Amino acid sequence: MALLAASENLIYFPQRLDPAGRQGILARYPGVVEVSITATDGVGLHGWHVRGGTGPMRPLAIYFGGNAEEVSWMLAFAEVFAGWDLALVNYRGYGLSAGKPSQQALLRDALAIYDHFVGQPGIDPARVITVGRSLGSGVATYLASQRSMHGVLLVAPFDSITEVAQNLYPFLPVRLILGDLYNSAALAPAMTAPLRMIVASHDEVIPVQRSQHLFDAWGGPKERVTIAGAGHNDLQQHREYWQAIRNFLRR
């Protein structure tokens, strides 16, 4: 168990947000609401709520980032989600969220984040989607397995972190060391929510077969968009990436 815990720690690269950064965000985005959520174990999670929807009942997109991602960067692209509320909450240990990340904690926190936002006045529970990028694809897939979703948008996803690591280090007993980490493929066959998967044509982190395995296993309606010329960490620099997100939101 100690080896497993130590190995899992290698997955996370928490990025913090200092007080000056927080003040800068509040000044730059005056319409953004700061959010504090208490996890089931008492850990405080911090994030942002962009109210982009209109009307008495608003659709909601809940975003989960990568393993080295402080999610406030997404505020600069909130207009992509025009017509939708956008929930950006940092993993524990990231941004201004307290605690230490682990698979068990992040999956449990995803449920708390969903329940918090869906419980807010004016949020339409029938029109909630989850968006997961890289590590966040595992969190988003788990959330979609536990809560009703209008749709699931996965960016540079994997079938299982353990399988990705085994591809990268075929000479090591990765499955023995890591155990079963973020096994989205095991959850995929039971999914009924529509999936849009966005992948990079030159992803140097997630082998193409790992994304394809998840796509093939998905039980609900699905479509796959490949961003030509993109790598794992520069998808956001391609106009086609943001257009693929907009198109999914408008369906």
Predicted regions and their residues:
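Short alpha-helix in the alpha/beta-hydrolase fold that links the catalytic acid
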Residues: 77, 184, 193, 207-216
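Catalytic histidine-centered segment of alpha/beta-hydrolase-like enzymes
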Residues: 230-240
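An N-terminal hydrophobic leader/cap segment in hydrolases
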Residues: 1-36
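Membrane-embedded segments
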Residues: 40-116
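Active-site nucleophile loop of the alpha/beta-hydrolase fold
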Residues: 149, 153-163, 180-184, 230
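Alpha/beta-hydrolase fold nucleophile elbow
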Residues: 123-134
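Acidic catalytic loop of the alpha/beta-hydrolase fold
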Residues: 202-206, 232-233
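Short beta-strand/loop motif that positions the catalytic acidic residue
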Residues: 190-192, 197-203
